[in-house]
Amino acid sequence: MSPELEQFLNANASAIFGLLGALGGGVLSFVAALLLKRSEFSLQLRSKIVDRQIAAHERILKLAQEMRVMVSSGMLGADGEVARGPRILLSKDEFESWFTRFTEQQLEGSTWLTTATKREVAFVQDYLVTLHMHLADVPSEKCFDLAQLIRQDFIDLSNSLEKVAFAFFETGIHRARPDSLLDWHKYKRPVTEQRLTSTALLQNIAEFKGTLSKVPK
């Protein structure tokens, strides 16, 4: 180091260190502000994700609750009790309207549903599609007769759908991260077929249609 430079440094050491301190403090402040900004953005993003997940699962819970709303026909059933069935099967028009709304509602937020919820929703939809197909052969005035036979199906489907959707609020809500879209959204085919086969709908529909065919027109 040259004598001139050494002399300059000695004479201005305080100023130089003060300048370096100011620069260092400025850099640290900038870095801290940047990290804080990133943290705030991350929190805002997580909040938006959670809000959409909550809304999607709340829609499924509402649909599940609607499925188990029962109404009475005012007549006594074979067991001597007042016959009851799902309100959404009071008539074909009632079912068509609700089925359309079910499809629209579950699609609206399907991206934000947990994989488990998607699979149960898909199974319920398979059941409803099967029911819709069979209703084509059932007069609207006989729709509620079928509803009474498959009442337990709607109770079971409602409970299973509600259970899997509510599980998100118990555990998934704390993750603030949606499940992968690469996960298959349906149960394996043997599982779906076995569950459908065990429903009151598929166990009773042939006999029910047979009874209808014997009714004088």
Residue spans of the language-model regions?
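Conserved non-transmembrane functional hotspots
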Residues: V31-K217
